[in-house]
């Protein structure tokens, strides 16, 4: 069914404006039949952040910003779904056009600007689907016009704690002016201290909801030293590596679009984000698991991220070019690799290549 859907939908969606195509995809998923996915190979099961994942392949934040279709995505075979980025108040984001396909590079540039319907609307949808279970994380951010951005994060932690499987603190989007400044040492330490404190205040009522930190791939190694040290000292539960990049490789072929302002994702991000996963893994020293994101478009790419240090992986841009069937393809490739190598779980290979990757010349 998914293959047939991809065969029909992908060519049609390519004719549409990227943002209109995305909106249509969300509407289509809301109509997806309530069919249970095939059971995952037991060898793909992962335990991380105190949660049990049936498989390691998730969908990254940005696809389902307003929690309109998390259950359809879970039925398509994703091991987990991350909704958002959600801000306390609704906001329209940046003016259109703000989403661009770089088709020859299998990449996307976006400058969306945290467009979303706000916490109240997302909370209502998550409450309505709570009975269905599944791992649904909430990616939280600050409103562009906020006078106290840290207070925005705290408010969202308190609001969503009863319903979120985990939180992602997003301080790495390049499309909200000044947001990435929250990755600087003093600001990040204050933010994480207040976020973790908020989580502790609601623990009795909401449980111990894991808090993850999502970082940019454009950090220097010195900056990464500080970020990981602070994340460890503030006892975050994990990190997501990495968000979109502001860098533009000279090898990009879509010369007319490559200089559009915004964050670049997709295949050209793969090498940089994989290096950042490995660098973070080495610095974390097992303190917490990582989710690897950036340019994953095949089972081989997912395996490379895992061997670099990712316990879980997330996709988004590759779905634009490969379709929803990519999820099952990646899982099949990972299971086949485990069978062929005689391993019982992916945990046995997490970070196996990190020392080799980090020994390569920097920058990549």
Curated annotation (Swiss-Prot):
Topology within the bilayer: Peripheral membrane protein
Enzyme type, top EC level: oxidoreductase
InterPro entries, sorted: Aldolase_TIM (IPR013785), DHO_dehydrogenase (IPR050074), Dihydroorotate_DH_2 (IPR005719), Dihydroorotate_DH_cat (IPR005720), Dihydroorotate_DH_CS (IPR001295)
Major site of localization recorded for this protein: membrane
Active site residues of this protein: 173
Reactions catalysed: (S)-dihydroorotate + a quinone = orotate + a quinol
SUPFAM superfamilies: FMN-linked oxidoreductases
Protein name: Dihydroorotate dehydrogenase (quinone)
Species of the source: Rhodopseudomonas palustris (strain TIE-1)
């Amino acid at each position: 069914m998914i293959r047939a859907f991809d065969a029909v939908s992908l060519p049609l969606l390519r004719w549409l404006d990227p943002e209109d195509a995305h909106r249509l995809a969300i509407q289509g998923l809301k109509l997806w039949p309530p069919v249970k996915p095939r059971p995952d190979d037991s060898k793909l099961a992962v335990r991380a952040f105190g949660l049990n994942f049936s498989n390691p392949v998730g969908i990254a934040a940005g696809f389902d910003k307003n929690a309109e279709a998390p259950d359809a995505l879970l039925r398509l075979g994703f091991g987990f779904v991350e909704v958002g980025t959600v801000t306390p108040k609704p906001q329209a984001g940046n003016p259109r056009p703000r989403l661009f396909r770089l088709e020859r590079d299998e990449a996307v540039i976006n400058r969306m600007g945290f467009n979303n319907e706000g916490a109240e609307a997302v909370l209502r949808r998550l409450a309505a689907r709570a009975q269905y279970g599944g791992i649904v994380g909430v990616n939280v951010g600050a409103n562009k016009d906020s006078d106290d951005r840290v207070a925005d994060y705290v408010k969202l932690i308190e609001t969503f704690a009863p319903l979120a499987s985990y939180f992602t603190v997003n301080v790495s989007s390049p499309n909200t002016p000044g947001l990435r400044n929250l990755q600087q040492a003093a600001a990040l330490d204050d933010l994480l201290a207040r976020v973790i404190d908020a989580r502790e205040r609601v623990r009795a009522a909401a449980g111990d909801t894991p808090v993850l930190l999502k970082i940019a791939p454009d950090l220097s190694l010195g900056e990464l030293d500080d970020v990981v040290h602070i994340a460890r000292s503030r006892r975050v539960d994990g990190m997501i590596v990495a968000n979109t990049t502001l860098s533009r490789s000279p090898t990009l072929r879509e010369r007319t679009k490559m200089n559009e302002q915004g964050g670049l994702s997709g295949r050209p991000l793969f090498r940089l984000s994989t290096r950042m996963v490995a660098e973070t893994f080495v610095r974390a020293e097992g303190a917490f698991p990582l989710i690897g994101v950036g340019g994953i478009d095949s089972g081989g790419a997912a395996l490379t991220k895992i061997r670099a240090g990712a316990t879980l992986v997330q996709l988004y841009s590759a779905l634009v070019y490969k379709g929803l069937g990519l999820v099952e393809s990646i899982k099949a490739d990972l299971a086949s690799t485990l069978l062929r190598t005689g391993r019982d779980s992916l945990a046995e290979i997490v970070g196996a290549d990190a020392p080799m990757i980090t020994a390569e010349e920097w920058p990549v």
